[in-house]
């Protein structure tokens, strides 16, 4: 399928200890031999060779280690060579240029993984998981990515695909061999229980999609309260840095201030907001409106009150405003008051916030990842929803007693949409777009 040999820098292109230039293709070893001073043409697979990269005049260019991987037990199922050179930007580029001059083509973004997919080493969901691992910004996202690399999506979907194939096969037998006595006549009543069971399974997967996306990207967490209750002090304490301006003047925070923390293996995307109150200050009012907009989209609310004062009407309005949100009620300024109400008591200015950390850890346990695998990829989720829509149309047709051979069209469409998630049914232009989002050298 791929006749050329490709090469690219696989490590970050900046000065460092080591850089890796990767080649893949039938000529990978032969091309490397042209610029290496030791004989590697007959080298065994999965071996490392010390020597020097040399220019056409046999002058040494760099001291390197060459790793040889012979097909098919490689990342791409082609011959692969990895040149480990010193990590300077100049020397890395120079060696790549020599590799290209010796006969390799510069790899396109994601082309190594694309070859792994086309050669059947991984399915499309596993290829996407590779990119998810590269982009992972927290431990949970990395855990989800490694599950995907190990084939969790395929394991999740294959029972659904097999169920559809069973239904399609039953319909096909009735269409092709209606005259055989041992072929039981199929009716929509026979198909309906299997269809309902299938829809229940897919609904269970889709019900956990939002959780998967939150864990992958982080949980949008908004800090809400009246002015001067200590929201900015709390943000600074959580981030362990002075990111937000803190003063005794109410309304100091007029725009959104953001940061990220990790609680256990979960990432919280923190947003400190302007204090929500009635204000005649136009600039402050803009900040308050932004706060209210962010509140609508937030998945978790940290509702902060001044623990040294009784709740007033504005506090009660905030309780009402956030009642339908997942929230933690926090009383700040424990250094100035006694903990006399139910809630989480802290002193943000003194960095005494462990009760809040404990509450957050209890809120997001790792049990979420111990259940079925979670889907978080937008393409995969979209195709899963399309498959569900196909089967809902099929179910509607069954309720109307439509003939099974007509119902098969929607069932086949659902089957194809699930196979598309794994890349077993695909369009070349869409695959090119998908792999183009990968980094060079992967």
Give the role of each language-model region:
Residues 1-143, 147, 151:
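A glycine-rich (often HGG/GG-containing) alpha/beta subdomain
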Residues 284-308:
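Inter-motif core of Ras-like GTPase G domains
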Residues 50-70, 251-279, 297-300:
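Switch I (G2) and immediately adjacent beta-strands of P-loop GTPase domains
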Residues 16, 46-48, 297-300, 324-327, ...:
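Short glycine-/polar-rich loops that comprise or flank the Walker A/P-loop
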Residues 270, 304, 330:
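Generic enzyme active-site microenvironment
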Residues 250, 276, 284-288:
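Short alpha-helix of the ABC ATPase nucleotide-binding domain corresponding to the H-loop/switch region
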């Amino acid at each position: 399928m791929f006749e050329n040999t490709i090469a690219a820098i696989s490590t970050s292109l900046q000065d460092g200890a080591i850089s890796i230039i990767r080649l893949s293709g039938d000529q990978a070893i032969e091309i490397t031999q042209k610029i290496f001073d030791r004989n590697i043409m007959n080298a065994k697979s999965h071996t490392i060779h010390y020597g020097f990269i040399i220019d056409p005049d046999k002058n040494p260019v760099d001291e390197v280690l060459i790793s040889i991987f012979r097909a098919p037990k490689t990342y791409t199922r082609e011959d692969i060579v990895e040149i480990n050179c010193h990590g300077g930007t100049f020397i890395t580029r120079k060696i790549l240029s020599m590799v290209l001059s010796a006969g390799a083509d510069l790899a396109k973004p994601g082309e190594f993984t694309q070859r792994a997919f086309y050669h059947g080493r991984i399915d499309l969901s596993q290829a996407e998981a590779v990119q998810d691992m590269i982009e992972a910004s927290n431990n949970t996202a990395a855990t989800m990515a490694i599950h995907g690399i190990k084939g969790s999506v395929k394991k999740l979907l294959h029972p659904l695909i097999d169920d559809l194939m069973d239904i399609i096969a039953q319909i096909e037998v009735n269409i092709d061999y209606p005259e055989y006595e041992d072929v039981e006549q199929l009716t929509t009543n026979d198909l309906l229980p299997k269809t309902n069971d299938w829809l229940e399974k897919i609904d269970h997967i889709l019900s956990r999609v939002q959780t998967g996306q939150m864990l992958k990207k982080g949980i949008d967490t908004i800090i809400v309260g009246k002015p001067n209750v200590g929201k900015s002090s709390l943000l600074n304490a959580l981030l362990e840095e002075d990111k937000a301006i803190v003063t005794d003047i109410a309304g100091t925070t007029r725009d959104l201030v953001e940061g990220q923390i990790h609680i256990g293996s979960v990432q919280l995307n923190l947003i400190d907001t302007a204090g929500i109150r009635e204000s005649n200050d136009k600039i402050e009012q803009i900040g308050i409106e932004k706060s209210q907009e962010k509140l609508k989209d937030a998945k978790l609310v940290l509702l902060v009150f001044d623990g040294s004062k009784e709740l007033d009407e504005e506090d009660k309005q905030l309780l009402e405003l956030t009642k339908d949100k997942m929230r933690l009620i926090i009383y700040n300024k424990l250094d100035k008051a006694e903990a006399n109400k139910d809630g989480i008591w802290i002193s943000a200015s003194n960095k005494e916030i462990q009760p809040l950390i404990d509450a957050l850890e209890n809120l997001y346990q790792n049990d979420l990842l111990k259940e079925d695998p979670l889907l978080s990829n937008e393409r995969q989720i979209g195709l899963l929803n399309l498959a569900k829509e196909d089967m809902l149309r099929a179910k509607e047709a069954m309720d109307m007693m439509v003939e099974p051979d007509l119902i098969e069209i929607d069932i086949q469409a659902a089957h194809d949409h699930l196979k598309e998630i794994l890349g077993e049914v695909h369009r070349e232009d869409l695959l090119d777009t998908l792999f183009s989002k990968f980094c060079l050298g992967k």
